[in-house]
Swiss-Prot record:
Its cofactor is a divalent metal cation. A divalent metal cation 2 binds at residues 169, 201, 230. Gene3D superfamilies: Metal-dependent hydrolases. Its EC number is 3.1.-.-. It comes from Drosophila mojavensis. This is Phosphotriesterase-related protein. One of its GO terms (biological process) is catabolic process. Binds 2 divalent metal cations per subunit. CDD domains: PTE (cd00530). GO terms for molecular function: hydrolase activity, acting on ester bonds; zinc ion binding. The keyword Hydrolase applies.
Amino acid sequence: MSRVQTVLGSITPNLLGRTLTHEHVALDFEHFYKPPPADFENELRQKIKMSTLGYVRLYPYSSRENLRFNDEEALEAVRQDVLLYKKHGGGAIVENSTYGLKPNLEFIVDLAKTTGVHFIAGTGHYIHATQDATHRNLTVEQMTDMYSKDILTGIDVNGRIVKCGFIGEVASVYPVQEFERHALLAAGEIQEVLGCGVSLHPHRVSKAPFEIMRLYLEAGGRANKCVMSHLDRTIFDMDELLEFAKLGCYLQYDLFGTESSYYQLNATVDMISDGQRIENIMKLINEGLVDRLLMSHDIHTKHRLTSYGGHGYHHIHMNILPRMFQRGVTLEQVEQMTVTNPANWLSFNA
């Protein structure tokens, strides 16, 4: 019988409800700090407030406070937003913070207990540059053992055994570093054995998703249990995206709510808007790919939380889905993307 492994235990897939497949509720993102423009340095060093919020929205990675997504203020703001998500019909959140991002399993478990939202935690490794010395020299065999234990045996969290429910996000740069290659191979090997879902994070060039899918597939991983994240900032050409879709993985648009065209982590491209995300998803639906589409926000900075003037985890449900309905997307298609596809991806033995 198929099951989904949440941080509070296994459940049947039909209990998930509408699911956000790529989010963070606690992590350390300070590795990605970018020095601010000299003229705005003072504003971006201050606490986030109305008089500085405009600067933070344009240069989110130049505010260290914005990147501290694990301090007391951030955790309380996250809690309030998860409650809003639940209030507006949210059922589950897939937490993608892995080794290198300092995930907080204790907080995730507490959120699951106190909000009624199902949380699925991931195992795996983020990019090489975020790892400490104890992880950087791990072999493929050591990684497979680690991921397997996190899923099958679980992790002791204050005396409670918490099991991870998927592998991800497994992240890499381009070209893929040796450490990252090990993580991709380990993910493919474990997926083949356990039948779990996998989520991959490509670098910010269009060739990257092709390269990491090749490594994952060569290791034995199944394409139909793999999600390619961040396609809305990676593959902009529809013909190239359709070519990539032939590999058979889930196609995820997971930066909903990011409306600034200036993308600080890759200034050579213009970030697309929510309207363009909807347009692209509709094109993919028309190509017969509705059963492989996923949507999320990838919230990982304070300024995207409602307490800091952001959109929160309920943005897709309250703002995006109504716009999709207005443009002709059917309820059946929305349910496929937000309920059925996440459940199929997260289900073991499916």
